[in-house]
């Protein structure tokens, strides 16, 4: 296996950083509803909820990300757009649709500023022309393909980003501390390789994310009264 260079490592770290300006801090991925409903109430239940969200995401966002990365490596815009559409059709929650499209467009615009690539430019134009939704995982796949970074790294960064977003939101809404949230992240990070191997052979037709409690919380989120920035 080719050793990753220091520059490649730093690229991976940069795009996995919570300070990446794509708006992730504005979302909780339904954690607000889970707190209101009592599904999450301490560090243990928080860890279980984040793990369930990450596992569901592997079979949906993760599959779309891998498909987009592979299509981008072939310079196949139609394949990228197909991954985008397939994911949007399966992300039925209002918050999740808003989250993935808002963050996706911002990531695409950032990618064009940092490391412009023709295919990324075509994807962003398709978003602006309302031809494609512009889902965040698809943008991540495009970005990493353009940087010639492997799909496994893109998958891991996306997986980490979701978990980091949720525990960051938890710190603002419930009684947990940084030791709790870092322990959760450490445990979930240890599972990402298995999650990648589980879905690496999936095609777009295999995308699935059966997690009924999580889906109910996503649907309930629109009416939730718990908010991250409540004062």
UniProtKB/Swiss-Prot annotation:
Protein name in the entry: Urease accessory protein UreF
Annotated localization: Cytoplasm
Family: Belongs to the UreF family.
Domain of life: Bacteria
Gene that this polypeptide is encoded by: ureF
GO molecular function, one term: nickel cation binding
Keywords, comma-separated and alphabetical: Chaperone, Cytoplasm, Nickel insertion
NAD as UniProt keyword: no
Subunit-structure text: UreD, UreF and UreG form a complex that acts as a GTP-hydrolysis-dependent molecular chaperone, activating the urease apoprotein by helping to assemble the nickel containing metallocenter of UreC. The UreE protein probably delivers the nickel.
Gene3D superfamilies reported in the protein's UniProt record: Urease accessory protein UreF
Pfam families: UreF
InterPro entries xref list: UreF, UreF_sf
Function description: Required for maturation of urease via the functional incorporation of the urease nickel metallocenter.
A Gene Ontology cellular-component term: cytoplasm
